[in-house]
Amino acid sequence: MVQYFTEKGPTYNEVIEIIKKKYGKNARVMTYKTVPHGGILGLFSKDWVEVSGYVRYDIGNQQINVEDEKRKILQSIKREENSSIEDVLKEVKSLKTELAHKKENINHPTITKIEDILRENDFSENYIKDINEFIKREFSLSDLDDYERVREDVVLYIAKTIKCSGSIIDNLKKRVFILVGPTGVGKTTTIAKLAAIYGINGESKSLNIKIITIDNYRIGAKKQIQTYGDIMGIPVRAIESFKDLKDEITDSKDFDLILVDTIGKSPKDFMKLAEMKELLNACGRDAEFHLAVSSTTKTSDVKEIFHQFSPFNYKTVIFTKVDETTCVGNLISLIYEMKKVVSYVTDGQIVPHNISVAEPLTFIRRINGYRISDDAEFIKKIKSKSYY
């Protein structure tokens, strides 16, 4: 626990002596300055020295103090054997409150180490605070000495906060998959990857897939997706109007899955987003929106993207370019704090590779400082452990 202090005196050396007597040898000076002292209405004052600093108390002492408090209250209860049940219950309640307060203020080395790792991985301060509260809620002071046990449970807790939807074909109720998102996040390549893994590399059977693009503005966009389609033997249609899109969807009843590639839009271009939403309404009730976001995007910008694309009522988020970022803590924090669900992650440009169905382990493996020795055992623990 850290205690901060400010002391004053005629000279610097005298103040230091005061600090040593009051706070002991562990006291540390942060700043000092000259301040006026005495006088009348600001006149005839003398210059004194004001010193500010802190003292860190050893965790062991904190634990001893907690045990002392237990003994004191228990002795008090014993002395008052004739007290009523209500009085005893009050004493016990007071003990719980006091011990909880002391535990809350203890900065155990295990907690400090875990907080440092989370910050290094770019987790948000709110998320770190939540982890801190989880640790203090789930572990006793003696349990905190077992760093490996606490670390393992923290990793499991983090995994529980990552909500994933599974494959889009696990429960194929909506057969029109529309991918929206800002410019340059890799929507076209992602559409091609999905077409490849479900159209020509299906595990049980390949689906009958069609690709539709409404991106007729970006130079080479139509040619790019058409090339992918030709290589895979999957039909590609370029659409420009609401009527054409509606007719194309109607004429595609024999297809199991229709993948729609859209125009990249700035989340700040509200008018363009509204126009695109109106056009895509032609896909009807069979349509399902998904949002593509680059993992390299700043946290504040990702929040903006989540918010500005909300009119599309997107079901899941696809994080692209995961291979281009060194930290995923900000992504985990965002999907937890903003209650988002992740369906896929991409980590390269190669079609049909470099895409996978998102699962908690996908993100956990990328947390620097945490290692998973047995994936199967870890997944089993995720399913069995419950913190909610």
Curated annotation (Swiss-Prot):
SMART domains per record: AAA (SM00382), SRP54 (SM00962)
A GO CC term assigned to this protein in UniProt: cytosol
Pfam families: SRP54
GO BP: bacterial-type flagellum organization; protein transport; SRP-dependent cotranslational protein targeting to membrane
Protein's membrane topology: Peripheral membrane protein
Keywords, comma-separated and alphabetical: Bacterial flagellum biogenesis, Bacterial flagellum protein export, Cell membrane, GTP-binding, Membrane, Nucleotide-binding, Protein transport, Transport
Subcellular location: Cell membrane
UniProt function note: Necessary for flagellar biosynthesis. May be involved in translocation of the flagellum.
Database matches in PANTHER family: FLAGELLAR BIOSYNTHESIS PROTEIN FLHF (PTHR43134:SF3), SIGNAL RECOGNITION PARTICLE RECEPTOR SUBUNIT ALPHA (PTHR43134)
Name the UniProt record assigns to this protein: Flagellar biosynthesis protein FlhF
